[in-house]
Amino acid sequence: MNLFTSSIIMTLLMLTMPIILTSASTHKNKSYPQYVKTTVSYAFMISTIPMVMFLYSGQEVIISNWHWMTIQTLKLTLSFKLDYFSVIFMPVALFVTWSIMEFSIWYMHTDLNINHFFKYLLMFLITMMILVTANNLLQLFIGWEGVGIMSFLLIGWWYGRADANTAALQAVLYNRIGDVGFIMAMAWFLLNTNAWDFQQIFAIEHENLNIPLAGLLLAATGKSAQFGLHPWLPSAMEGPTPVSALLHSSTMVVAGVFLLIRFYPLMEHNKTIQTATLCLGAMTTLFTAACALTQNDIKKIIAFSTSSQLGLMIVTIGINQPHLAFLHICTHAFFKAMLFMCSGSIIHSLNDEQDIRKMGGLFKALPLTTTALIIGVLALTGMPFLTGFYSKDLIIETANTSYTNAWALLTTLVATSMTAAYSTRIVFFVLLGQPRFNPVIIINENNPLLINSIKRLLLGSIFAGYLIFHNITPTTIPQMTMPCYLKMMALAVTMLGFILALELNSTTQTLKLDYPQNPFKFSIQLGYFPIIIHRLLPMMSLSMSQKMASMLLDMTWLENVLPKSISYFQMKSSITVSNQKGLIKLYFLSFMITLILSFFVLNFHE
Amino acid sequence: MPVVYVNIFLAFIVSLVGLLIYRSHLMSSLLCLEGMMLSLFVMLTVTVLNNHFTLANMAPIILLVFAACEAALGLSLLVMVSNTYGTDYVQNLNLLQC
């Protein structure tokens, strides 16, 4: 027991060391990035001790350290819950972060503020660890907000670029909308269960949990970019590639899913929220996979792929399989981070070119990156016995054989085939064919930092699924028997996506120019969702305020009602009434003739 | 009736005819208007002085004041027309537009 708790405390404290030592100005040192990287690697190695202890003896620990304050009847403490989820997620997250930090030493090498960047990455990692190991809702909320803030700071890392600032602001705003749901859930739990500790919440039998669970679902929608609050994730690709790899593929965006997984004892018995979760996840995965089919920026395609996989995780929670969703979180971290790192290697080698229409023929030029990209793509689509297979195939099988919403199931299958389609598109445009980039660049991936980090995640992508799956305690009994066509469904749908995409991509080499049709326009403009939501609402409120303030009050009441209306009315009526034509001489002549005639008539009448 | 009234009355008629019949310049009708006012002034003064109509001694001066006002008004209209068209030809006024 002592080894468990002391390892965890040492892991968490070690991570905070480089931040605390800021006062000793180690952060101005030139080798601060290496220091941070080795700190994270040591933290990873130490955190594998509790994981192994848990896997082989089933020991769960709750560390309750410090009583902060008691607000009337609510006791706020600093406590860490180290159960199945956090003890397995911590080593995985630390491993991925270690590789990403090594990669970003290479990627951000020419940046003058690289020490600052590493400090931000480390602060993000600490808040993510706080989120994952929290035992009460307050600590989770601290971690939740912390990852949101660090995401904002890291997305806007190149703050001189207006698009980056917009994207960072977008991330914060969408996360805030989700936070409303989180706070609502916290308030409900405070009012009805008088505690924010998980043990007490799970021990009480509640009658109707719709409100807090809906609040938690909203929070997950905001943080994990589900449909309705999703545009921030593709926009967040404005940040540097290590940020995309760490935050927006493996760790931060799974925080929403992690929250729902934490609350699985409450969600087990609530069919309404499960159905809502299922439909939301199915909608997300289909929509974002459809949007990924026509994007031209390699990072945006991978971002939409992340969003689609997050939708798949939410679907898994919706069919009441939280442990499978957690398994998918862990396996997804490996290959998604690796995909982002490969794209970073490609972007850096091609001199900051991110458009796949300007890449090509990298198959022979970047061998290790090519290998890693293809293996990552295969793992993503669920190639048998790679990492993704163990979680994704199980999810599809369980969804196929469970008593669930048929529409959600169908959309999930369609989204799975679309996954294969856009992955083929990436491979086809980036790696195959003739080069379409500038000839005068130096393509070099010969740096040990890059090679080692990609190799590590490559080994993880191939073996981690097997290792994790065969060592964890079985929690829910997987469905062992099912008809053959259902068993083959995931594989068949994926192969269909592959073949279709390959055919389409090959035939595009020989087509004439065609103007985009409506489904294409729908896909490439992200379903018109960002355009409508980001522009329509502000435009309506601003134009309404302009009309009310300046046009209604100033122009109408003060200007138009009496003065201008009088002059306008007079003019219009005089135009209507007058029928003169301005023949003045004629009028004067007739006047004179009248005078003379009257003179004669009145004088010589007799 | 003294003959002088006939003379002044004739002057008035001549000015009136000149006001109503003119060729092209608006200025000439304004001048004839002044002529009308002048003859009226003289007639009024002669009448008041000959008949010792003491209470009406102010009348010619008031007439003069009003004549001056209307002359100013007429001139301002002439200047406005002349500003728009450059000349004061009366055939320019055939287009009424509000």
Swiss-Prot record, chain B:
InterPro entries: NADH_UbQ_OxRdtase_chain4L/K (IPR001133), NUOK/Mnh_C1-like (IPR039428)
EC number: 7.1.1.2
Entry superkingdom: Eukaryota
Enzyme class, UniProt record, top EC level: translocase
Membrane topology: Multi-pass membrane protein
Catalysed reactions, semicolon-separated: a ubiquinone + NADH + 5 H(+)(in) = a ubiquinol + NAD(+) + 4 H(+)(out)
GO cellular component: mitochondrial inner membrane; respiratory chain complex I
Compartments it resides in: Mitochondrion inner membrane
Keyword Transport listed: yes
Broad class of where this protein is predominantly found: mitochondrion
Gene3D superfamilies linked to this entry: 1.10.287.3510
Pfam families: Oxidored_q2
This protein's UniProt keywords: Electron transport, Membrane, Mitochondrion, Mitochondrion inner membrane, NAD, Respiratory chain, Translocase, Transmembrane, Transmembrane helix, Transport, Ubiquinone
Disulfide pattern: none
Family recorded in the similarity comment: Belongs to the complex I subunit 4L family.
Function: Core subunit of the mitochondrial membrane respiratory chain NADH dehydrogenase (Complex I) which catalyzes electron transfer from NADH through the respiratory chain, using ubiquinone as an electron acceptor. Part of the enzyme membrane arm which is embedded in the lipid bilayer and involved in proton translocation.
Quaternary structure (record): Core subunit of respiratory chain NADH dehydrogenase (Complex I) which is composed of 45 different subunits.
Name of the protein this chain belongs to: NADH-ubiquinone oxidoreductase chain 4L
Organism per entry: Ursus maritimus (Polar bear)
Underlying gene: MT-ND4L
